[in-house]
Amino acid sequence: MNQFKVISKFNPTGDQPKAIKSIAKGIEKREKFQTLIGVTGSGKTFTMANIIEKVQKPTLVLAHNKTLAAQLCSEFREFFPNNAVEYFVSYYDYYQPEAYVAQSDTYIEKDASINDEIDKLRHSATSALFERKDVIIVASVSCIYGLGNPEEYKKLTISLREGMEKDRDEIIKKLVEIQYERNDIDFSRGTFRVKGDVLDIFPASSSSKAVRVEFFGDEIDRIKEFDVLTGETITKLKHISIFPASHFATSKDRLEVAIKDIEEELEERVKELVSQDKILEAQRLKQRTNFDIEMMREVGYCTGIENYSRVLDGRAKGTPPQTLLDYFPQDFLLFIDESHVTLPQVKAMQAGDKSRKDSLVEYGFRLPCAYDNRPLTFKEFENKLNQVVFVSATPAKYELEYSTNTAEQVIRPTGLLDPEIIVKPVKGQIDDLYTSIQETIKRGFRILVTTLTKKMAEDLTDYLKEMGVKTRYLHSDIDTIERMKIIHDLRKGEFHVLVGINLLREGLDIPEVALVTILDADKEGFLRSETSLIQTVGRAARNSESKVIMYGDVITKSMEKTIKETNRRRKIQMEYNEEYGIVPKTIIKDIREVIQISDIAEERKEYDNLNEALKSYNNDIDKLIEKYEEEMKEAAQNLQFEKAAHLRDVIYKLKKDKETEL
């Protein structure tokens, strides 16, 4: 069995060894909840990697968005090149859920664009859990959504061995049952092809490698893995497991039982609707459900089959759905990254889903069993947990209340200190701010200014521009790409001051920033809470010459706690630096890290100028669509989701224009 092994030229330093030892010991002692408090730049991911190596448990790392999950996955792959590090997020590039708006009698059909590459990665993640123990899966909150029964998934797996007596046609039938399609021409993921005694299978978890099974009569003579593009043999295999092409694949026996249950529920619900004098709704439900049943009987699945997942799984009404958490063995470990943001997200998921389903069930679009195709409630999520480590610079009440052990990671290996905090009165704050900005610009650094309202942010931006200061305003209407472009320009020095409201917290690490100012710091509220203030102060923690100015006439409890905590961390780091002779030094990351993303914003302009693009293709709209489709697939393969989604929208527009012309 493969062991987790961290590969790195660095060894744990500062607070890392102590934190690793403390958390690992807690895991060995069966502590259920622990917290790792780690400041910005202290190497929390490296600590997590070393904990995984120590405890040797299959691990799930939960992040609060796709981008952060991709970043963490990339870092873990660097630390664990010889282990399975997988990525599991929502596979929708675009998703419009099914809904019904009663006021306008509008039914909105489910519309989705599935990213084939992410679907492959999801299959790779689940199959890895059945094949090995050394698995790390980095996931978004998508992992608390229904995924199909892991027992059924495992039961439907086709196991093939060299020398095994197996009828070729029987294997083909089983492949169809687990939702593989026969395609002798377009051989792609989730398909198989047959030529004489040779059966080629393209696994759902692969993008470039397929499996060739050669028969001699009814015996499997040879199994080999080959490159789909070149046809060259990669390796000879003694055994291969073919996992289902869909997580919702169901055996024929189970499907027949499920169909009977669906028919019974339909009969009951139709009677109920008729008794309420809802004849139209009853007729609609009967028609839609019978069509789905017919599809299931014919091809084994139907559009929206997930709405019947509770019946297909044989679960009782109201019981929690099976999720990625159920695919893990019982002794798995869970890290919840940025837990102060991620946990509230998990808590909010189920309520929104139920309110949408209410009208679908009430007006006869769905059976009541659709309610159980949902994310986990927070209580259900808690019940599925084994051992959890919350990771945050500012853990919330829940984490601190439930944790029986807390490890702190304050010391940064770089020696950088938390910034000095200065409190100044509100009166004359704009004049003082202007003076502080000029001083910081002279030293060659940048400035972040956080305000309480949109109006104030806009007015302040206009004022600073009038005073000759190069200023930009980062507001909530700006999309991810444009936001990254603005940050890129700030780092390059295209402008010097960035003004924002609630946008200067997690994930905005700019080493060139030497001044962070917080206007109206004494106005208590969620934007000026202790958590919010500590996160905002952390934005200045990448520069050795940085400071934070809080403008307020009184020192609130949140301000007091933030100042006290920052000073405590400064003291610890200063003592460490003195002991080991470390001189704090700003580490300026290569600006190219952001250029890759900001380049997409430039590409958008190119894609949006369709008239120019068509001219360069002699007005051949089909050729242009073909080019953009290739670029979209390439972008998705490189996990450039924003670019892929934008290209999809451009292609859709071109196809619409083409239809109009016809």
Swiss-Prot record:
Binding partners and assembly: Forms a heterotetramer with UvrA during the search for lesions. Interacts with UvrC in an incision complex.
Name of the protein in question: UvrABC system protein B
Classification via NCBIfam families: PRK05298.1, uvrb
Every Helicase ATP-binding domain range: 25-182
Keywords: ATP-binding, Cytoplasm, DNA damage, DNA excision, DNA repair, Excision nuclease, Helicase, Hydrolase, Nucleotide-binding, SOS response
Family listed: Belongs to the UvrB family.
Location of the protein in the cell: Cytoplasm
Domain UVR: 622-657
Chain positions of motif Beta-hairpin: 91-114
Binding of ATP, residues: 38-45
Functional note: The UvrABC repair system catalyzes the recognition and processing of DNA lesions. A damage recognition complex composed of 2 UvrA and 2 UvrB subunits scans DNA for abnormalities. Upon binding of the UvrA(2)B(2) complex to a putative damaged site, the DNA wraps around one UvrB monomer. DNA wrap is dependent on ATP binding by UvrB and probably causes local melting of the DNA helix, facilitating insertion of UvrB beta-hairpin between the DNA strands. Then UvrB probes one DNA strand for the presence of a lesion.
Description of its domains: The beta-hairpin motif is involved in DNA binding.
